């Protein structure tokens, strides 16, 4: 396939009510992107993925199924559209995958969402379970897999009790084992090839979500370990379907960040470095005692992977009127998560089928970003819908993320994992005469994304 980016923009681009609608404009957009990348004309015999895989190959389709619920509130329909990949992108890609791999191939729709996410409820609500069942009835070799071997189930005891301008929440995080990947898991150690190599804060790396474990067991001395499902390592092609949205820790979440959803053992993934300013990036100031207490109460371990959480943030309505405090590295000077993003991309692309790091890429990654309804503001889960009517695709995730970030109206060099990419090296084609551009609302504490 060509080393370019294909962009499809149409003011009428909308998700169809029926994801199987063969005449949908979403399908037209997917076809345009694949035609531009392959250099092939579309006809009845067209097999756009046939240049990437052969009969009997294994394809992973990786959407963003992050969650349908953020602890104590359900995501409303607009917010859901803004944070998860729409199922109408998945249907034509399953059809093209089947045409390429045939009856003896394997197509797996897979994700490893945030630890608290209920995968079964999510894929059911998003309509993906119905899609998979329909294709299975047709004889397609397609599966739906939660790549995690455990989840942390939130149990609300007190849910959103309003105390003045605060929302009081009390509950438990209960660790529950999951079937995981039938092929098992492998641990890959990047050693000196990690972006954390010689990082001065190696002993203070922390993971920011429900599980209380620290990533020190995976990041120490010159060791930097990541855990992948073997189904990923066995894949010949990964079709990466990220959402176009902002992220309060990494600035944006696009093709590269979406690969984090292929990893197991989330608590091995450093999100921030404990401390403030010169000693870390968790806070932008020396935290007050009240802030330290509030952060401590967020997750209190009680053994066996279980924990208590006590949270009393200001209400959502109030948070829109005031600037929220920084915690867990959610600001523009985070110097940690971008390294994790680069490490995971390296592991996904360069690990061979046995879990050893190779010198050359071991599988292809085709990325198509869903920007039909994008997410702006306090993403990933707090993003609000922004209707951009655009799809972008490429075999080069780094260039794709660079151009998507530029289209969002941000300074690409403020996104640390893109800082070495030069715009002059990027080629793109668009169905419109002009590259579409937008101005996304940044996450809080990321206003500097606009600076030149």
Q: Over which residues does each language-model region extend?
A:
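Extended, low-polarity segments enriched in aliphatic/aromatic residues
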Residues: 1-452
């Amino acid at each position: 396939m060509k080393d370019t980016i294909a962009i499809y923009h149409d003011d009428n681009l909308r998700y169809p009510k029926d994801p199987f609608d063969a005449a949908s404009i979403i399908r037209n957009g997917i076809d345009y992107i694949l035609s531009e990348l392959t250099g092939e004309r579309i006809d009845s015999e067209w097999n756009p993925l046939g240049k990437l895989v052969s009969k009997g190959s294994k394809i992973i389709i990786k959407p963003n199924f992050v969650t349908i619920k953020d602890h104590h509130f359900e995501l409303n329909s607009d917010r859901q559209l803004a944070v998860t990949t729409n199922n109408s992108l998945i249907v034509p890609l399953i059809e093209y995958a089947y045409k390429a791999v045939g009856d003896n191939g394997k197509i797996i729709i897979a994700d490893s969402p945030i630890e608290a996410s209920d995968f079964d409820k999510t894929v059911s609500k998003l309509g993906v379970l119905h899609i998979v069942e329909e294709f299975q009835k047709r004889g397609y070799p397609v599966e739906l897999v939660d790549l995690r071997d455990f989840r942390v189930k939130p149990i609300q005891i007190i849910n959103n009790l309003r105390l003045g301008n605060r929302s009081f929440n009390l509950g438990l995080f209960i660790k529950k084992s999951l079937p995981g990947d039938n092929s098992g898991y492998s641990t890959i150690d990047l050693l000196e090839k990690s972006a954390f190599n010689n990082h001065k804060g190696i002993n203070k790396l922390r993971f920011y979500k429900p599980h209380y474990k620290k990533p020190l067991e995976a990041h120490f001395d010159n060791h930097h370990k990541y855990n992948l499902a073997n189904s990923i390592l066995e894949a010949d092609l990964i079709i990466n379907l990220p959402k176009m949205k902002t992220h309060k820790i990494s600035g944006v979440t696009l093709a590269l960040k979406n690969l984090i959803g292929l990893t197991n053992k989330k608590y091995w993934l450093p999100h921030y470095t404990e401390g403030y300013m010169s000693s870390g990036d968790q806070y932008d100031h020396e935290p007050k005692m009240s802030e330290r207490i509030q952060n401590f109460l967020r997750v209190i371990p009680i053994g066996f992977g279980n924990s208590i959480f006590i949270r009393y943030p200001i209400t959502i309505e109030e948070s829109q009127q005031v600037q929220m405090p920084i915690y867990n590295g959610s600001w523009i000077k985070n110097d940690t998560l971008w390294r994790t993003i680069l490490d995971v991309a390296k592991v996904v692309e360069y690990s061979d089928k046995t879990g050893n790091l190779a010198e050359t890429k071991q599988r292809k990654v085709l990325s198509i970003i869903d920007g039909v309804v994008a997410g702006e503001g306090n993403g990933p889960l707090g993003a609000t819908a922004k209707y951009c009517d655009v799809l972008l695709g490429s075999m080069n995730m780094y260039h794709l993320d660079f151009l998507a970030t530029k289209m969002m109206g941000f300074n690409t060099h403020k996104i640390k994992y893109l800082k070495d990419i030069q715009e002059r090296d990027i080629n793109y084609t668009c169905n419109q005469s002009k590259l579409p551009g937008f101005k996304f609302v940044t996450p809080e504490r990321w206003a500097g994304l606009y600076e030149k």
